[in-house]
Amino acid sequence: MTLRIFDTGTRSLRDFEPIRPGHASIYLCGATPQTQPHIGHVRSGVAFDILRRWLIAQGLDVAFVRNVTDIDDKILTKAAENGRPWWEWVSTYEREFTWAYNQLGVLPPSVEPRATGHVTQMVEYMQRLIDNGFAYAAEGSVYFDVAAWTAAEGSDYGSLSGNRVEEMEQGETEITGKRGAHDFALWKAAKPGEPSWPTPWGDGRPGWHLECSAMATWYLGGEFDIHCGGLDLQFPHHENEIAQSHAAGDGFANYWMHNHWVTMSGEKMSKSLGNVLSVPNILDKVRPVELRYYLGSAHYRSMLEYSEGALLEAAAGYRRIEAFLTKVADVEAGQWTTEFEEAMNDDLAVPRALAEIHTQVRHGNSALAAGDVDKAHEIAASVRAMAAVLGVDPLDEKWLDSAASDSSTNAALDVLVQAELQRRTEARAAKDWATADEVRDRLHAAGITVTDTPDGPTWALNN
């Protein structure tokens, strides 16, 4: 079965056909390090790490570029407010993002370019746009001429977001010298006290959109397979990337993939709303692999509504996989099931893929209970293969090395708690409510919360 992905550009499911057979090229809009990473930031990293892992598992050689926007208005403002040099400020938080990605088992990118290291490529890109008649210099800045581009044959401006030009607001603060209200800055003229770089049009610094076109095409070529990012980047950032890239003569990305937000009480997690939960804060509640499991458990195009209950339920789900594999112990990864493959090839339907993993875990536990060790090993090998694609294989060195003692302790605890839960289930079936309540209360006194679900009871440690 061929991988089908939802292409935002065409608003349809499309078969993935890489430009070069056996290879895949992916560009992901990475961090703008201005503050501590929160779980909304890293959801994108986890979502497209799963895409990358699935392509690798299919035998493709994947070139994966994730940029760092290390200069922009917000970084300069934050650094100034805190009395710190801008480069020190951004370096501090870039390290925190790297730490967060590593904690969650996100594979390092093939290359992680910084905007400030690619000014030469940006200058070349701007010159091409000026030569083609789609950009102009004005008082030290360089702007993209939206009117000229929309009037050009083959222009598709607005097609990604579905917006009409007259409805678009670019949010640019610079207006001096702009020919049109919708034009956006490719290069911003130097201001006193701000960092700047020399160009033929004057000293200044990069505009937000230009950097990604320049870096993506520098490392992946003028045409590459997939461009990824958060839904909030669809407009204006990705729309403008497409415009300037096509206007420069590049085919750019063949597929566009966007992950949805993490929300709290229906609101997008955002620093401006004050509803963010930092990665270190969440890791006080669960292990890194459990947070990864949680962030990857919803479909990447679905909103992920955060609640502590949902986080702990996801952690309990991971522990069920972990407990089974720990009981089977020494087993190599085998082959995933057909159901898992069909789910992953259906636009990365991770909820279905996880459901298949848990189905196999139940079968494996039944085999162990029946004394069929060979069958249990066969199932465990399949479970390892499937969990590895999602980056949550409990027997992977990443998780064994980082939490070996926690892993064995939790697995042993799970065996004991499951025995108590089985006793409670039997008591409830016999309408022996006193015994059922006694088991629940004893677990609660030990710091364990029991939640009844359609698939049976789950448990989680209280904070």
From Swiss-Prot:
Q: What's the top EC group for this one?
A: ligase
Disulfide bridge map:
none
Summary of subunit composition and partner proteins: Monomer.
At which positions is Zn(2+) bound?
C29, C212, H237, E241
From the record, which residues define motif 'HIGH' region?
A: 31-41
Q: Where in the cell is it found?
A: Cytoplasm
Task: Give the chief site where it resides.
Answer: cytoplasm
Q: Which Gene3D superfamilies does this UniProt record tie to the protein?
A: Cysteine-tRNA ligase, C-terminal anti-codon recognition domain, HUPs
Q: Give the EC number(s) listed in the UniProt record.
A: 6.1.1.16
Any keyword ATP-binding? yes
Quote the gene name from the UniProt entry: cysS
Write down what this protein is called. Cysteine--tRNA ligase
Give one GO term, molecular function aspect: zinc ion binding
Q: What is the lineage of its organism?
A: Bacteria, Bacillati, Actinomycetota, Actinomycetes, Mycobacteriales
The record's listing under InterPro entries reads:
Cys-tRNA-ligase, Cys-tRNA-synt_Ia_DALR, Cys-tRNA/MSH_ligase, CysS_C, Rossmann-like_a/b/a_fold, tRNA-synt_1_cat_dom, tRNAsynth_Ia_anticodon-bd
The protein's required cofactor(s) are namely: Zn(2+)
For the motif 'KMSKS' region, give the residue ranges: 268-272
Query: Where is ATP bound in this sequence?
Result: K271
Q: What organism is recorded for this protein?
A: Corynebacterium diphtheriae (strain ATCC 700971 / NCTC 13129 / Biotype gravis)
| Record keyword ATP-binding present | yes
